[in-house]
């Protein structure tokens, strides 16, 4: 049947929703499957997720609704924080516990001090080669599809930054650490690198995302909680953060009535702000208009992404 959503609901019954839900994605579910279940509960016309999580991983997955999807790409550049458990002594094809064991090695005796020294050597900017089991493309095909066919191709290294790698627990051949890293970092590769620095091999046994950009786990809702409220749209909407919540670290520029009108027409205006920076734009009364960019000298503002329809929902919940 034509024009139905993922749950079989006619498109006419879907509604406009604007805002951001901080979902606690459960293990064993793809990010897209989680997105579709949330979208179905909200009966939302438009939704997308920011910062995909592997099925094995759990934790913070921001779901952007409506016009908030226009700003979701900006969150992809944000730093992320993970709680990871690494199992030493076995390397798998996928770099996590879902893959076949392809190498075993003895685990040398170690204490917390030796683990911290090895971890310190991985902190900072570095070149990281993405794993074959990843969603990156080569020749139009996903790398993980090639890997499943037994094909391995050369992957260009990517520059990433490990801001912090902190040991939380050492229990025999298992290490638990907190990782704060830049976009594009593969924690599975980092786990293998740390195991190698400790004189053995290893893989990710569990992974949980704790934070992404300005968001942390304190405001997350579980999938079960969301679906339990599906009969009460008002209660569901009360879980939403305003659309500009994901831009909290971006400088803000306040515009007057005349400047607001010009910006909404796509025209640059005179305004003071940090030179060369992207900024949040607000009109009279503090309504969120979208994202703009200041010129190098910081005296003119050009609109980048107009999100004026979001203004009405900016008061959903701070």
What function would you assign to each model-found segment?
Residues 63, 84, 140, 190, ...:
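Residue-level signal for inorganic ion chemistry
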Residues 40-42, 58, 62, 152-184, ...:
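The conserved catalytic core of RNA pseudouridine synthases
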Residues 84-86, 165, 177, 207, ...:
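A structural signal for short, well-ordered beta-strand segments
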Residues 1-49, 53, 57, 119, ...:
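Accessory RNA 3′-end/elbow-binding domains used by RNA modification enzymes
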Residues 68, 74-128:
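Acidic, low-complexity central loop/insert segments
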């Amino acid at each position: 049947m034509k024009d139905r959503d993922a749950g079989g609901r006619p498109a006419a019954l879907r509604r406009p929703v604007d805002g951001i839900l901080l979902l606690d994605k459960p293990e064993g579910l793809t990010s897209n499957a989680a997105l579709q279940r949330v979208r179905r509960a909200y009966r939302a016309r438009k939704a997308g997720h920011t910062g995909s999580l592997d099925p094995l991983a759990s934790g913070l997955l921001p779901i952007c609704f409506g016009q908030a999807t226009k700003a979701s790409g900006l969150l992809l550049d944000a730093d992320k924080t993970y709680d990871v458990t690494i199992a030493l002594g076995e390397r798998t094809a996928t770099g996590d516990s879902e893959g076949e064991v392809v190498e075993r090695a003895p685990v040398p005796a170690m204490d917390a001090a030796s683990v911290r020294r090895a971890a310190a050597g991985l902190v900072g900017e570095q070149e990281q080669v993405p794993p074959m089991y990843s969603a990156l493309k080569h020749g139009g095909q996903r790398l993980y599809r090639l890997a499943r066919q037994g094909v391995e191709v050369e992957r260009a290294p990517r520059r990433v930054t490990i801001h912090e790698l902190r040991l939380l627990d050492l229990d025999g051949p298992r290490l638990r650490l907190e990782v704060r890293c830049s976009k594009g970092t593969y924690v599975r590769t980092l786990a293998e690198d740390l195991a190698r620095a400790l004189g053995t091999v290893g893989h990710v046994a569990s992974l949980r995302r704790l934070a992404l950009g300005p968001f942390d786990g304190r405001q997350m809702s579980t999938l079960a909680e969301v679906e339990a409220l599906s009969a009460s749209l008002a209660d569901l909407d009360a879980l939403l953060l305003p659309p500009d919540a994901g831009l909290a670290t971006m400088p803000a520029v306040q515009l007057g009535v005349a400047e607001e009108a010009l910006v909404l027409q796509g025209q640059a205006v005179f305004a003071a702000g940090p030179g060369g920076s992207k900024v949040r734009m607000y009109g009279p009364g503090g309504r969120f208009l979208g994202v703009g960019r200041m010129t190098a000298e910081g005296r003119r503002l050009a609109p980048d992404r107009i999100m004026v329809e979001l203004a009405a929902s900016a008061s959903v919940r701070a």
